Amino acid sequence: MNTSGKISVSVLIPTRNEERNIGACLDAVAWAGEVIVFDSLSTDATIDIAGEKGAAIVSREFDNFSDHKNWALANIEFQHDWILIVDAD
């Protein structure tokens, strides 16, 4: 746990058009020291909602699950050693 009372874990949430789910998902991981929404070019309000909730946002076009996740792990500068990947729904 860090000085803010949050757990030293980075949460990565891959999304695409998850406006119905992203708010509740972000509320559920509010305990984490870092929350990143990894968006696949959503055309709905996913990014707006994530931004309002204080999540960091990284966007990248989706190619396939494996490459997308591996790209995130290799290219995003996470604040914590532990990374939890959570579906928005």
PLM region descriptions:
Residues 1-28:
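N-proximal low-complexity "stem/linker" segments adjacent to membrane-targeting elements
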Residues 8, 33-34:
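Residues at the starts of beta-strands that form the adenosine-phosphate
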Residues 23, 44-53:
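Acidic helix N-cap motif at the loop->helix transition within catalytic regions
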Residues 28, 39-48:
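A conserved acidic beta->alpha catalytic loop
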Residues 61-68:
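A short, glycine-/small-residue-rich helix N-cap motif at loop->alpha-helix starts
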Residues 70-82:
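Active-site nucleotide-sugar/metal-binding loop of Leloir-type enzymes
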